[in-house]
């Protein structure tokens, strides 16, 4: 039986890592030993930041809603409490979108919420 070597497999693995490391600075884009460390760290950052993105966007939506509501004499917490009382089930993403792009629709929602404070 002939000896099974992993020449093609390791070559493909190295190519895959180096392709992923394209654009990195210094030896990180050409030297496999350096590149694999950088790629693994980049994947860890990507994993972490996919979760943080959700947190960041929620904060952004809250800031936008708060700014838009304050123009009408309310505070974010009062507005959200009033929305719950009126049983208007619109999430923060849509409310922020309305506040930025469709101010007439947002004003009507604010007026309905003001009636229940």
Swiss-Prot record:
Coiled coil: none annotated. The keyword RNA-binding applies. The keyword Transmembrane does not apply. GO terms for biological process: ribosomal large subunit assembly; translation. One of its GO terms (cellular component) is ribonucleoprotein complex. Pfam families: Ribosomal_L20. Signal peptide: none annotated. PROSITE patterns: RIBOSOMAL_L20. InterPro entries: Ribosomal_bL20, RIBOSOMAL_L20_CS, Ribosomal_protein_bL20_C. One of its GO terms (molecular function) is rRNA binding. Keywords: Ribonucleoprotein, Ribosomal protein, RNA-binding, rRNA-binding. NCBIfam families: rplT_bact (TIGR01032). PANTHER family: 39S RIBOSOMAL PROTEIN L20. Belongs to the bacterial ribosomal protein bL20 family. Binds directly to 23S ribosomal RNA and is necessary for the in vitro assembly process of the 50S ribosomal subunit. It is not involved in the protein synthesizing functions of that subunit. This is Large ribosomal subunit protein bL20. It comes from Rickettsia peacockii (strain Rustic). The gene is rplT.
């Amino acid at each position: 039986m002939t000896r099974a070597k992993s020449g093609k497999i390791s070559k493909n693995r190295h190519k895959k890592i180096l392709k992923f490391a394209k654009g990195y600075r210094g030896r990180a884009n050409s030297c496999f030993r350096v590149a694999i460390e950088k790629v693994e760290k980049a994947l860890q950052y990507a994993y972490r930041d996919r979760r943080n993105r959700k947190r960041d966007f929620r904060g952004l939506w809250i800031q936008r809603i708060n700014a838009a509501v304050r123009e009408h004499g309310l505070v974010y917490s009062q507005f959200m409490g009033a929305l719950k009382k009126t049983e208007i089930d619109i999430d923060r993403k849509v409310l922020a979108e309305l506040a930025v792009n469709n101010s007439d629709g947002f004003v009507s929602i604010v007026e309905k919420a003001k009636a229940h404070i």
